[in-house]
Amino acid sequence: MLTRFAPSPTGYLHVGNARTALVCWMYTRSQNGKFLLRFDDTDLQRSDVKHIDSIVQDLRWICIDWDVIFKQSERFKHYNEVFLQLITKGHIYACYETKEELDIKRKLQLKHGLPPVYDRSALLLTEQEKFCYEQEGRKPHFRFKLDRNEVVKWNDEVKGEINIATSSISDPVVKREDGIYTYMLPSVIDDVDFNVTHVIRGEDHVTNTAVQIQMIQALEAKVPVFAHLPLLHFDDSKISKRKGGLDIKSIKENEIEPMALASYLIKLGTSDPIEAYVNMQSLIDSFDIKKFGSASAQFNLSEIHKLNSKVLQQMPFEMVKERLSQIGVNSPEFWYFIRNNIEKFSEVAEWWQICKSNIEPVVLDKEFIKIVLDALPQGDCNENTLSEWVKAIQQTVDIKLKDLFMQLRLALTGAKTGPELAKLLIFIGKENIIARLKKY
């Protein structure tokens, strides 16, 4: 088995494409297959090497690896060879209409209630007429000639049986006037050459699939298995590169854990509940492409933030040991305590600083703080220190328990809320507690 993911490097990787990449990768890895990463960069003016680099980084960030990687721009010579073969066999033909002329044709067809399908008038041109057009300075674009008598059928892994009548489809342009190949033909040539067995992509490619099946047949190659995923929606609009904040770069900047995003994207739109997974293997083991429904799924960034907390709560110390070391935390006990109280990993450093550094405590009542200091139990802090301390304070001053805890937390941490104070005292330590209270 070989699947492929083929992004165009014209922008940052967005969540819709990331989901497709994850599904392709998990589908093949769940069956011990191979994964191919291809960059569709035939349009050299719009493609940018910086986007290739960023897509590679983003895919690695969400734990995707690959067995083969290449750029289509490295294969132009081969595309040209196949292109000429298809012209010779009558599968591709030259057209000379301008964009304006094609637009007029479409408008006339629609005006008369006809489908806006290309009329193949270029097939009627004589060699003399073609020569005259070229003398005018017109450069041809090229179309693939569809078999319009066929209803293309395939059994889709997600959508079931699909039937597309090619009589309702225009012969697709495969090469533009400027010599640039469109998406269609190079994609088919690559799939054939690399023996791609399964093509998984969004349902917006269903019509393209019917066209490409005929192209594959023209190359006398085996048609792969196809799967078309329902699209993701955000605020009732399709996810696209133009939707701000929905690229992987922005997701990372929001401090989302890779496994939180992967867990969400793989389960979104399936019959499985969306749950937190902390490693890819467990997610692969639960994967089944048949569980995807046919309806579009609503993408909700706030749900990913909730899932992020759950992923952090399940991470063992060994998984985050190196990251913790980078912020000066080497205590497994602190990690297992604090992981249940954070939404983002950066909060670990914040609470470590609160415990170990000089902070500015908030004091509402200086006299009360003197009483608190005098009532502090002897010995090192343990899980019983807080309860003993509170009892001693209440024996000295009449104060509501809620107010007592709030003032104590403010004086020791500078914050109104936070992790369980009884355990937090252990990590702050007796010396720091006394130093903070003595400031007042």
From Swiss-Prot:
Coiled coil: none annotated. SUPFAM superfamilies: An anticodon-binding domain of class I aminoacyl-tRNA synthetases (SSF48163), Nucleotidylyl transferase (SSF52374). InterPro entries: aa-tRNA-synth_I_cd-bd, aa-tRNA-synth_I_codon-bd_sub2, aa-tRNA-synth_I_CS, aa_tRNA-synth_I_cd-bd_sf, Glu-tRNA-ligase_bac/mito, Glu/Gln-tRNA-synth, Glu/Gln-tRNA-synth_Ib_cat-dom, GluQ/Sye. ATP binds at residue 241. It catalyses: tRNA(Glu) + L-glutamate + ATP = L-glutamyl-tRNA(Glu) + AMP + diphosphate. Pfam families: Anticodon_2, tRNA-synt_1c. Its EC number is 6.1.1.17. PROSITE patterns: AA_TRNA_LIGASE_I (PS00178). GO terms for molecular function: ATP binding; glutamate-tRNA ligase activity; tRNA binding. A motif ('HIGH' region) lies at residues 7-17. It is found in: Cytoplasm. A motif ('KMSKS' region) lies at residues 238-242. Its main location: cytoplasm. Keywords: Aminoacyl-tRNA synthetase, ATP-binding, Cytoplasm, Ligase, Nucleotide-binding, Protein biosynthesis. GO terms for biological process: glutamyl-tRNA aminoacylation. Transmembrane segments: none annotated. GO terms for cellular component: cytoplasm. Belongs to the class-I aminoacyl-tRNA synthetase family. Glutamate--tRNA ligase type 1 subfamily. Monomer. PANTHER family: GLUTAMATE--TRNA LIGASE (PTHR43311), GLUTAMATE--TRNA LIGASE, MITOCHONDRIAL-RELATED (PTHR43311:SF2). Catalyzes the attachment of glutamate to tRNA(Glu) in a two-step reaction: glutamate is first activated by ATP to form Glu-AMP and then transferred to the acceptor end of tRNA(Glu). This is Glutamate--tRNA ligase 1. It comes from Wolbachia sp. subsp. Brugia malayi (strain TRS).
